């Protein structure tokens, strides 16, 4: 029931906690140790529960940083170009550090692709606006409808006196499928489709719509030679776009919406809940199907010639699709929407800027400092790393803000100091039945209410949130085996800890010079029975907590990276 404290824990490291509570790809849940036992904690849904009670969109918002008054403490001006997740995150942290920050965006609204690319039924606009307002209230100046390369340039910003510039412009171009007939009327990009819907424009898409996904995203990722986690994030972003476009088409009145992609159902990224919800809403899925060409009459799309895909990846998991000759068929449609990923628009660059691009269409940066090839010009988010999740962009923005602060301060800069506090817990007890609870599915509205912009997820109730939170294994608490002969806590090899362990994760082995304790951390449930059973206190349960030095020395708050 300590909801305010829990909210601050969730919000302080994440300026977009309310947004992430609704649309985050939750990579943290992949790493959750509870998932090794049954299913991970529903971290995203619990974050939403907390922000609905105490976030900026709630009726009872709480102060995120008690005792800290935001204000301009430094003279050096910083320009942040792009009001998406990376730009907002960086502006937030720079403002807390006392910098006068001006944020520019080409769109008429802030939020980047969170506003332009995510349907309102997934991310209510009042939540997004409240989160942005909270950041602007720190003293950040916002200039909308301002396009880099058209309304201003990097050189003009330098002339205005900006000491540092952060490029966080994201990826707003749609990728091309590069097949015959792609220029027909009725073939549109997924990004343009979502952008127009989210800005309030309406247009006819006909009664039968085919949404095409996959393919190009995979090959672009493979060519970029990204690490596995980056490739996974790019695939997740592409699948989100694919599902958002498909379900939005249904909400626009199309009677027949088909989703086709090269991947088999088993190979589709793991958003099974969204796929199931789409099927309930009437979406028809055609896995393992490729687009050979678009067919038209008098310049207008009438259908797609498809071909069956037998495999997408080779044995090394490289994108290398193979197709079945003779499996061609025609799928009639009024509109085809290409949801095959995002690309950069680097038309703003000029030789005088000194900013270089990579072969993949991103900006070349130093991965440690986030600085581009131009001194004082930094880059973060998708424009620097390619398509990734919102939470990755948030992290990029925070890292970029820290490096900008380091660049501006020069020799006076001090790194953030993290302190560790270790506490021995006597008679540690976990919540009752914590190890027996199953993961609770996030509640959604009934099918007949999934219309227009009505939000599909409704979030946990208080009892549901408490039950889900009780499943946490409290990984900051660990069993410590550290006997000391002088203190009388040396292990006496009684084996009691092994006997009481309910998960059989302990083994006591004899070796030539003594004994050895082996513990399987992957199945330990932190019950503490081994520590309770140990007659000489060789085993203790100890909590490890980290915090900023500024939390105990307020005079350092100005230079702390929150």
Show where each model-derived region lies.
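Iron-sulfur cluster-binding cysteine motifs and their immediate structural context
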Residues: 1, 21-50, 102, 109, ...
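Mid-to-C-terminal Rossmann-like scaffold of FAD/NAD(P)H-dependent oxidoreductases
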Residues: 276, 280, 290-300, 312, ...
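Feature captures the FAD/FMN-dependent oxidoreductase FAD-binding
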Residues: 72-81, 129-180, 293-305, 310-313, ...
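Glycine-rich dinucleotide-binding loop and its adjacent helix/turn
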Residues: 50-71, 130-150, 174-251, 357-373
């Amino acid at each position: 029931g300590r909801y305010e404290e829990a909210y601050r824990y969730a919000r302080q490291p994440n300026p977009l906690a309310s947004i992430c509570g609704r649309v985050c790809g939750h990579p943290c849940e992949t790493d959750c140790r509870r998932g090794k036992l049954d299913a991970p904690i529903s971290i995203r849904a619990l974050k939403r529960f907390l922000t609905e009670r105490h976030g900026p969109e709630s009726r009872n918002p709480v102060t995120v940083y008690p005792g800290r008054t935001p204000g301009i403490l430094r003279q050096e001006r910083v320009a942040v170009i792009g009001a998406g997740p990376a730009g907002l995150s960086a502006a937030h942290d720079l403002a807390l550090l006392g910098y006068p920050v001006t944020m520019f965006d080409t769109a008429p609204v802030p939020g980047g692709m969170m506003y332009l690319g995510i349907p309102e039924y997934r991310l209510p606009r009042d939540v997004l606006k409240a989160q942005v307002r909270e950041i602007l209230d720190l003293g950040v100046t916002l200039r909308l409808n301002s396009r880099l390369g058209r309304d201003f340039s990097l050189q003009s910003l330098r002339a205005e006196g900006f000491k540092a510039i952060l490029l966080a412009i994201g990826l707003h171009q749609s990728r091309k499928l590069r097949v015959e007939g792609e220029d027909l009327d009725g073939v549109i990009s997924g990004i343009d489709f979502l952008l127009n819907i989210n800005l309030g424009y309406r247009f006819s898409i006909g009664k039968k719509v085919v949404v095409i996904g996959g393919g190009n995203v995979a090959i672009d990722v493979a060519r970029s030679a990204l690490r596995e986690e980056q490739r996974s994030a790019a695939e997740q972003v592409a699948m989100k776009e694919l599902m958002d476009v498909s379900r939005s088409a249904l909400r626009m009145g199309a009677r027949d919406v088909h989703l086709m992609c090269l991947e088999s159902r088993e190979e589709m990224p793991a958003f099974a809940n969204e796929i199931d919800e789409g099927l309930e809403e009437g979406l028809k899925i055609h896995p393992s199907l490729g687009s050979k060409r678009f067919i038209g009459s008098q310049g207008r799309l009438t259908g797609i010639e498809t071909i069956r895909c037998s495999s997408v990846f080779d044995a090394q998991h490289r994108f290398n699709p193979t197709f079945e000759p003779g499996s061609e068929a025609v799928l009639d449609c009024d509109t085809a929407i290409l949801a095959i990923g995002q690309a950069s628009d680097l038309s703003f660059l000029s030789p005088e800027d000194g900013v270089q691009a990579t072969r993949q269409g991103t900006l070349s940066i130093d991965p440690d400092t986030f600085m581009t090839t131009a001194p004082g010009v930094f880059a973060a988010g998708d424009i620097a790393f390619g398509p990734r999740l919102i939470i990755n962009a948030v992290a990029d923005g925070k890292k970029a803000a820290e490096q900008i602060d380091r660049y501006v301060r020069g020799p006076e800069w001090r790194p953030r100091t993290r302190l560790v506090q270790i506490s021995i817990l006597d008679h540690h007890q976990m919540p009752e039945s914590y190890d027996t609870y199953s993961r609770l599915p996030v509640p959604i509205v009934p099918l007949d209410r999934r219309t227009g912009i009505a939000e599909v997820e409704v979030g946990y109730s208080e009892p549901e949130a408490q039950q889900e939170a009780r499943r946490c294994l409290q990984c900051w608490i660990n069993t410590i085996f550290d006997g000391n002969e002088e203190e009388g806590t040396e292990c006496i090899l009684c084996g009691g800890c092994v006997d009481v362990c309910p998960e059989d994760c302990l083994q006591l082995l004899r070796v030539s010079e003594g004994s050895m304790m082996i513990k399987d951390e992957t199945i330990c449930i932190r019950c503490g029975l081994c520590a309770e059973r140990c007659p000489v206190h060789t085993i203790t349960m100890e909590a490890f907590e980290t915090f900023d030095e500024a939390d105990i020395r307020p005079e350092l708050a100005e230079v702390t990276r929150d």
